[in-house]
């Protein structure tokens, strides 16, 4: 993957897309039963603070909120399973059970990392975006997300990558 100013320049030129749901999100039941993060509000199944607190594939620990969504429920479940079961995974098993939430809408200005031309322009590939990240000090996925967030071009939107394929359709998660 490109780094530093080269990555920043490439991100400024990559075409952003608009996408629409429905998507699936996996949420710990504790977020469905009470407000997240000790807040005094209603429960928030779209709260993105857990990724900020714990760190996630595209979310450097402590830097910004992220909401992870998947086209297919199995993809959302597989990503959570990776967090739970990997050595040094950031989600303890005691957070189970999980709830699947369907989210529908249109999101604009999405950096589509399933697009081969976008990956090429950023000097990366599907393997780098979907590979193991938990044990890395500075995973390329988080470096890319940090640069994309800093660019402001797609702030409040998602980064997309191809997690795996089921049948003939790629499963996307953001």
Go through each PLM region and give its residues.
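Extended catalytic/binding region for NAD+/ADP-ribose chemistry, centered on the ART fold
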Residues: 55-87
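Active-site and NAD+-binding cores of ADP-ribose-processing enzymes
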Residues: 1-57, 84-174
């Amino acid at each position: 993957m490109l780094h530093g100013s080269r990555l920043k320049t490439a991100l400024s030129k990559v075409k952003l897309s608009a996408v629409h749901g429905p998507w699936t999100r996996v949420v710990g039941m504790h977020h469905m039963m009470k407000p997240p993060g000790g807040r005094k509000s209603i429960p928030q199944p779209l709260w993105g603070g857990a990724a900020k607190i714990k760190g996630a594939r595209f979310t450097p620990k402590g830097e910004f909120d992220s909401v992870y969504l998947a086209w297919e429920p199995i993809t959302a479940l597989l990503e959570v399973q990776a967090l739970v079961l990997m050595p040094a995974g950031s989600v303890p098993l005691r957070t189970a059970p999980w709830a699947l939430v369907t989210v529908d809408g249109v999101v604009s200005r999405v950096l589509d990392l399933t697009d081969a031309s976008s990956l090429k322009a950023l000097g990366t590939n599907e393997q780098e975006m979907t590979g193991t990240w938990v044990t890395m000090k500075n995973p390329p996925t988080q470096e890319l997300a940090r640069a994309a967030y800093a660019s402001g071009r797609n702030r409040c939107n998602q980064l997309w990558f191809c997690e795996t394929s089921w049948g003939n359709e790629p499963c996307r998660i953001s």
